[in-house]
Swiss-Prot record:
Pfam family, one: TPR_Slam
Region called N-terminal domain, residue ranges: 25-192
Signal sequence, start to end: 1-23
Chain spans, region C-terminal probable beta barrel: 193-481
Any one cellular-component term (Gene Ontology): cell outer membrane
Membrane topology: Multi-pass membrane protein
InterPro entries, A to Z: Slam_C_b-barrel (IPR007655)
Lineage, broadest ranks: Bacteria, Pseudomonadati, Pseudomonadota, Gammaproteobacteria, Pasteurellales
UniProt record similarity statement: Belongs to the Slam family.
Official protein name in the record: Surface lipoprotein assembly modifier 1
Amino acid sequence: MSIQTKFILFLSSSLFLTPYSVATEKSPQPHDGRLDEQLHLAKPNLPQKTPALLTNNNPSKLSITKEELAKHPDLIIRGLIPAVLQNNGEAVQLLLPLYQPLPKKDPFLLEWAEAIDLREKGYFSDSVKAYRHLFSQKTDLLPLRYQLAQALFLNNDNEAAKDQFQKLRAEQVSSDSVKIIEQYLSALNQRDQWKIQGGFSFLNESNINNAPKAGTKIGNWTAWEKESARGFSYFGNAEKKWSLPHNHFTKLSLEGSGKYYWDNKKYNEFNARAGVGLGYQTARFELSLMPFTEKRWYAGGSSGGNAMKQYSKNSGARLDLSNWLNEKWQISTALEYGEQRYETRKHLNGNNYLASATLLYLAKSGQYWFGGADYNRENTRDLDNAYQRKNVRLGWGQEWKAGISTRLILNYARRAYKEKDLIGIRQKNKEYASVLTIWHRNFHIWGITPKLSWSYQKVTSNHPFYEYDKNRIYVEISKTF
């Protein structure tokens, strides 16, 4: 009897005699957007399965080395067939290198094992291609349909994965298999749900208007005096994706943020931004293009009043790209262009450019590092307000013993203005900033973990009016729904 005949007979008998088992999802924690979100991915909590290879119902166990196994092709084939049927990635990766050199190989069995191997290595797109080729040859194999659906799920081809899981659920499969299929379908539905996040922090500003040292003068010009303010900042974000065929999606993003000071209301502000666009995603890669419009309301600052008024609007487009290079390294980039218009300060009308890149390293489950660089250019009608800003960032997040977590972010930037101002100085600044945040993972208030942050800012400049430093301590509270 040929290898292919044995394989087909085994497939047929296994489908009728035993329910097929399914493997636990294995994917990089992909992470698209903010860092806390990149580290979390909606996925089903699937049961662990016992590898079928080298186990049986007898108390005695078969023990054989890889070298000895290579001398027995029949044992390799007898082990590989149930391994692919049972979606046993570990067994397939053990046996596939031993099966590939054999002179007589079944092409279908070989390609199936290679598809599983690609999935286990994280090459989900290539794995999907292999599974689709296999499935085009044998559409009646339920284990193959399941594994295709799983690979599509891992590759973020949501619509195709949902279609395959729904078809699989309609088959006569075991109740345990139905439960696992429904876990996948539930996870797919969650991917298209609204993601809502909001939070606020208390503010106690001792130098809200970034004033230099008291008494700073340039000729007959005297710098403004410090002002203090107490209040809170707040933000809210809502985002929804709609999955489209072939890994594409549409996306809606709504963002709002502001500051409210009860004892110095002329510094109150509110910003709102809305964007809608298209994107493409796999398990490791995401690309999106989002046209947006943004409005700002502001009370006016030192020369303003207590009521906020429409201050400016900005419309443009943003291109985001995120790619996991492997399980530990991720690179994210963003390009943005906007046209900015002011209600009264027409001399600030112009356009703005942003280019940003961040490299993330997940050292282990409780530690991450990141570094980034940003370039920002503001073009305004009056050239003394136009500038270029170049920034570098470093960050470190750590989970410590006793439930303590910390996050440290350091920034350094250079800002250079295009022309001299009224005093005759072409401003060049060096900007330093740091934020240290600490919280206890087991301390919650209504399901929310408060975080204590200390921030420090310092600006040195060739323009004495724009040199200052300040620090503040604040409590940060946020929640994702």
